Amino acid sequence: MSLPFYTIDDFNLEDKTVLVRVDINSPVDPSTGSILDDTKIKLHAETIDEISKKGAKTVVLAHQSRPGKKDFTTLQQHAKALSNILNRPVDYIDDIFGTAAREEIKRLKKGDILLLENVRFYPEEILKRDPHQQAETHMVRKLYPIIDIFINDAFAAAHRSQPSLVGFAVKLPSGAGRIMEKELKSLYGAVDNAEKPCVYVLGGVKVDDSIMVLENVLRNGSADYVLTTGLVANIFLWASGINLGKYNEDFIINKGYIDFVEKGKQLLEEFDGQIKMPDDVAVCVDNARVEYCTKNIPNKPIYDIGTNTITEYAKFIRDAKTIFANGPAGVFEQEGFSIGTEDILNTIASSNGYSIIGGGHLAAAANQMGLSSGITHISSGGGASINLLAGEKLPVVEILTEVKMKGRK
């Protein structure tokens, strides 16, 4: 597949100072500061290691959480974790673009790796502006003169237009890291060259995201069917005239999703037969799973899809040549209500189709179940992959594409 942006392969990195933007934002214990899950650090270690071994002086830029949150910390522990994963020294400095950071960058030798401080300690990083405006921020103007090449590997943040993500690409020869390259190849392939039949399984509680994706993939013809689960399914059931019971209808209203019920009516009419809804659900009665036909839902919380629906959905998944899934089928963390999520994941993993899971809770569930080897691609960036599938432009990809169009390498 021909990519519209440069990758690591397009650059000679020998003895060059390379700035690499990664997304190693990780779960951190707020009381000890220790990293609870180093999955993202392991993921990006591949790109960092390759750049360093090609003789570059590697400067790593990353963020952790955001101001006001308990896990908004320094990147000192991340440097230690990265060093352990790479089995080689990774230096850390508690500065981003000040004199200390710049002097440390200038002292780097071939093969050295330096992790700068949490980029979100810098207030301008939170601003969302045009890449050319971000290129004029203090951080970019201070750092770019001592950098030769910028590599962006932060796919999970590709939907954000912030200085560290888009500003450097305006000033420097720039390309995508290995994670960015792999993610975009997989997702573009699923959208532009999806083998038919193509089935999307959309669930979870982020109704706005799912409905954006549903509308885009049905309208542009890349999907043949959308199987709805989770709160997304409840929205469409209500839109189709099903009585969900006061508890479930109030839940939708309190979440601020009532407008999507009307939107659901329009979509059901426009894409008649292509949007599939559960014909039975599992509700929580005295902390136990009880299944009901959707025509007879009691005034109890819906926590999962029912077994008849699981069987019906499995047929669509097994027949599909391309499958994309995002969001769990129900409250899978609660005992007795993980059946829908688990069975759908098992069916996807055992299918012969090209399969993608869009990150987040569903990806975590697949990993916990040991099914990741049966999935063609598990995305590292839920928000970015959802935006791409919803037809939205990703600012990071846009500016990297502009770099290649202008031949700036």
UniProtKB/Swiss-Prot annotation:
Which SUPFAM superfamilies does the UniProt record give?
A: Phosphoglycerate kinase
A Pfam match is PGK
Per UniProt, where does ATP bind? Answer: E333, G359, G360, H361, L362
Q: Name one GO cellular component term.
A: cytosol
Give yes or no: UniProt keyword Nucleotide-binding.
yes
PROSITE patterns in alphabetical order:
PGLYCERATE_KINASE
Its BP terms in the Gene Ontology are: gluconeogenesis; glycolytic process
Can you say where in the cell this protein is located? Cytoplasm
Keyword Transmembrane helix tagged: no
What UniProt keywords are attached to this protein's entry? ATP-binding, Cytoplasm, Glycolysis, Kinase, Nucleotide-binding, Transferase
Provide the residue positions that the database annotates as binding substrate.
D23, I24, N25, H63, Q64, S65, R66, R120, R160
- From the UniProt record, give the pathway where this protein acts: Carbohydrate degradation; glycolysis; pyruvate from D-glyceraldehyde 3-phosphate: step 2/5
- UniProt catalytic activity: (2R)-3-phosphoglycerate + ATP = (2R)-3-phospho-glyceroyl phosphate + ADP
The entry lists its GO molecular-function terms as: ADP binding; ATP binding; phosphoglycerate kinase activity
Q: Which InterPro entries match?
A: Phosphoglycerate_kinase (IPR001576), Phosphoglycerate_kinase_CS (IPR015911), Phosphoglycerate_kinase_N (IPR015824), Phosphoglycerate_kinase_sf (IPR036043)
Stretch forming the signal peptide: none
Give the Enzyme Commission number. Answer: 2.7.2.3
Assembly mode: Monomer.
Spell out the family assignment given in the record's similarity comment. Belongs to the phosphoglycerate kinase family.
Name of the protein this chain belongs to = Phosphoglycerate kinase
Q: Which organism is it from?
A: Methanobacterium bryantii
Q: Which gene encodes it?
A: pgk
